[in-house]
């Protein structure tokens, strides 16, 4: 009835316009039933399809967020480990340079010790040789002196043809040689 009254109002105001309202709402009870069925269908579909779909999307979003945060954390840890490795590498390089310098210094010290030791041994050998030469020279001088004394005694004996006491003669000759020196 309401619909008929509505129809009358529309028809009375617009006369030449086709009956649009009648074609849109041919039967009001059918329209209300369709409207209620559509609302119920939307509610049922919302509960059966939309909410599980929304929950699934939220779970996927949460998984993606977890994976991204885990990836960021792992990337951060990897960057920290790379920095630590670089620091360790730099420390190793510095230590190797230090070890090389120390080894060179130690080698130089050992070289100098060996050279000093060799020089000392050479000086000792040279000193020993000089002492040996001096001793041999003294020996040779004594031998020459003794030979000269013996020659002088023999010569004097031959000249004088008589034998003088050998000790006295020897003393005379030694005094003569000392005077020559």
Curated annotation (Swiss-Prot):
The keyword Transcription regulation does not apply. It is a single-pass membrane protein. GO terms for cellular component: plasma membrane; proton-transporting ATP synthase complex. It comes from the Bacteria. Coiled coil: none annotated. Keywords: ATP synthesis, Cell membrane, CF(0), Hydrogen ion transport, Ion transport, Membrane, Transmembrane, Transmembrane helix, Transport. F-type ATPases have 2 components, F(1) - the catalytic core - and F(0) - the membrane proton channel. F(1) has five subunits: alpha(3), beta(3), gamma(1), delta(1), epsilon(1). F(0) has three main subunits: a(1), b(2) and c(10-14). The alpha and beta chains form an alternating ring which encloses part of the gamma chain. F(1) is attached to F(0) by a central stalk formed by the gamma and epsilon chains, while a peripheral stalk is formed by the delta and b chains. Belongs to the ATPase B chain family. F(1)F(0) ATP synthase produces ATP from ADP in the presence of a proton or sodium gradient. F-type ATPases consist of two structural domains, F(1) containing the extramembraneous catalytic core and F(0) containing the membrane proton channel, linked together by a central stalk and a peripheral stalk. During catalysis, ATP synthesis in the catalytic domain of F(1) is coupled via a rotary mechanism of the central stalk subunits to proton translocation. PANTHER family: ATP SYNTHASE SUBUNIT B, ATP SYNTHASE SUBUNIT B', CHLOROPLASTIC. This is ATP synthase subunit b. It comes from Mycoplasma mycoides subsp. mycoides SC (strain CCUG 32753 / NCTC 10114 / PG1). The gene is atpF.
């Amino acid at each position: 009835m309401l619909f008929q009254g509505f129809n009358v109002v529309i028809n009375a105001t617009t006369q030449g316009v086709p009956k649009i309202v009648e074609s849109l709402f041919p039967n009001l009870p059918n329209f209300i039933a369709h409207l209620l069925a559509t609302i119920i269908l939307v509610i049922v579909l919302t509960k059966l399809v939309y909410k599980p779909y929304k929950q699934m999307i939220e779970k996927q979003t949460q998984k993606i967020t977890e994976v991204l945060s885990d990836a960021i954390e792992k990337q951060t840890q990897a960057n920290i480990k790379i920095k630590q490795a670089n620091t360790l590498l730099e420390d190793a390089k510095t230590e190797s340079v230090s070890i090389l310098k120390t080894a060179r210094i130690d080698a130089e010290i050992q070289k100098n010790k060996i050279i000093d030791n060799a020089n000392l041994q050479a000086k000792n050998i040279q000193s020993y040789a000089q002492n040996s030469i001096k001793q041999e020279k003294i020996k040779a001088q004594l031998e020459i002196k003794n030979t000269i004394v013996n020659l002088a005694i023999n010569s004097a004996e031959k000249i004088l043809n008589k034998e003088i006491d050998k000790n006295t003669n020897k003393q005379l000759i030694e005094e003569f040689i000392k005077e020559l020196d």
